[in-house]
């Protein structure tokens, strides 16, 4: 199948040990850096004290701008003082690896005669954060429920299994759509900077952004002008 690059993210990751400055609670970090927009740099703390470190950018921009993600990953760690200091004594513990991330920014059919797609196969990765584990678990659970119903009714037709699509998009559709709009915001540095500056001055907005990855109702508040 041909990759729809505007709905696909190219990403690189490497595991590090010794990264400092990890906040209590092991929050994930997304760094939107001026020279790397509309891409982002991430630090995901792991249970063993290591960190998943990487970069991601929509595949169409990687192609248009001829971005070398491996070069950018190393440059970001070395170039920005707020990061280079934290990586001063850190060491990679494996090789850099590349991944393609199918984003949930486009609604697709995720079932048909005798099959249902879950997780990355269903393109359910969050278009803004790049996170996909939660949606993969949810889709797997939902598919299992639908499979049970199909077995009991002995009906594995696309028409019957379409209930799975409906259940997934009823639960995730608004969230994925909102994340796609937020992804587009990053394309406009002046507007993105405006939001960040406002967050620095507004505690409610700042806390909303911090927890937006966990709650669709809270994330939806970002669309309202009351901030």
What label would you give each PLM region?
Residues 6, 21, 35, 41, ...:
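Short capping/connector residues at structural and topological boundaries
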Residues 1-87, 102:
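Predominantly flavin-linked oxidoreductase catalytic cores and closely associated redox partners
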Residues 25-30, 146-152:
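Short, charged low-complexity linear motifs
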Residues 10, 14, 28-30, 34, ...:
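Flexible, active-site-adjacent loop/turn segments at secondary-structure boundaries
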Residues 148-227:
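C-terminal helical "tail/cap" subdomain of flavin- and related membrane-associated enzymes
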Residues 63-146, 152:
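FAD/FMN-dependent oxidoreductases across multiple families
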Residues 5, 65-73, 108, 114, ...:
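Generic structural signal for well-ordered, non-membrane alpha-helical segments
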């Amino acid at each position: 199948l041909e990759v729809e690059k505007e709905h696909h993210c190219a990403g690189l990751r490497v595991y590090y040990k010794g990264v400092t400055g990890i906040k209590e609670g092991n929050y994930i970090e997304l760094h939107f850096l001026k020279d790397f927009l509309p891409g982002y740099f991430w630090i995901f703390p792991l249970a063993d004290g290591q960190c998943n470190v990487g970069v991601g950018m929509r595949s169409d921009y990687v192609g248009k701008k001829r971005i070398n993600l491996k070069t950018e990953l190393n440059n970001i760690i070395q170039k920005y003082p707020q990061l280079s200091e934290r990586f001063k004594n850190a060491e990679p513990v494996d090789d850099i690896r590349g991944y393609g991330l199918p984003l949930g920014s486009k609604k697709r059919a995720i079932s048909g005669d005798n099959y249902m797609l879950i997780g990355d196969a269903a393109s359910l990765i969050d278009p803004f954060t790049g996170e996909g584990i939660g949606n993969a678990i949810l889709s797997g659970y939902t598919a299992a429920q639908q499979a049970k119903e199909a077995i009991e009714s002995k009906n594995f037709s696309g028409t019957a299994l379409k209930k799975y699509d409906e259940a997934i998009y009823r639960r995730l559709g608004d969230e994925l759509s909102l994340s796609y709009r937020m992804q587009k915001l990053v394309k406009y540095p002046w507007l993105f900077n405006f939001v960040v500056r406002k967050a620095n001055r507004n505690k409610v907005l700042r806390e909303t952004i911090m927890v937006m990855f966990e709650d669709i109702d809270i994330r939806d508040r970002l669309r309202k002008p009351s901030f």
